[in-house]
């Protein structure tokens, strides 16, 4: 919503480039874009909604742990789903799914029916996404910038800085803990 407001306020176009993985919420945020480009190795799509949890009651019983919950209503505690709670959550999931589908239909100028044919939760390769109208072009990032420069007649771009990803952060921290030599192991 904020990206759409930005476009309306500034009258500036938004072009999106998917470098690696832009699925589910990552795909949804692209719907405000005027053009969507993707690297040939990009995975995208995953148009759908999921809610999950664990029923740990069997494990708790084996371990002798008793779970106690005091609530203000019968549907407040969802540690052990009842059929009624499952129905409540399914309604919420269905509502969120319809909203997601409508956002994609609006963003990609497709009919809701056409989006629903693609919106079963699966991911798509860049080629599949392009063939299905989920993205506009497959290219390398510099090629997208060149196309944008030619189309818009400018070489001034505002690019979002990418924060270090969680996995990258974890791996770099783990790597820093690994000894670099036998001497480090012994000290």
PLM regions: where:
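N-terminal organellar transit peptides
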Residues: 1-28, 33-39, 50-187
